Amino acid sequence: MEHGSGNSGRKPSWLTGRGILIAVMFLLGLGIFLYPHICDWYYQYQFNKAIAAYDRFQGIDCEGMIQAAREYNERLAKKEEQFLVPAEEREELDHLLDPWETGMMGYVDIPKIGVHIPIYHGTEERALQSGAGFWYGTSLPVGGENTHCVLAAHNGLVKAKLFTDLDKLEVGDRFTLDVLNETFTYEVDQILVT
């Protein structure tokens, strides 16, 4: 008489239809849960690569570009219709603060909410998918009196956080804009929700 293992040729219980269904459902749920985290990690990795490439060029003399941006801001402050930006002016803006012709003019750091993303010219979808976008018709981000720079970024994207947690900032929180060889530190002085 032959003694067997007791299975008599039966499949393990997890290989039954029910076991496979449970395993597939578990893996599907795990994938759905991890997808936003993996995508955010990947996009932050891409943002960090772009910022590192930008920082490698920081050693060049950028004072002329900063001065040209400040002159643009002075002209902008005198305009009555600041938000109407003709195509030729956009062309000029696209070259200001972009010595490497990548479209990137700097990056924004908001430590409280873990934001460290590039700033690109314009608010077209291409720019907003790559980081924050500079709003044409507002001051270039080089500081100065009577200037007001507006940056836009997505919030609520599944694939990247970007400005999703912006509502967690409070009056007094600080953030920085790094543009060419200069770092500009700002403090939240008011919060308006519209």
Regions found by a protein language model. Give the residues of each.
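N-terminal Lys/Arg-rich, disordered targeting/topogenic segments
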Residues: M1-L15
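Solvent-exposed, non-transmembrane regions of membrane-associated and secreted proteins
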Residues: P12-T194
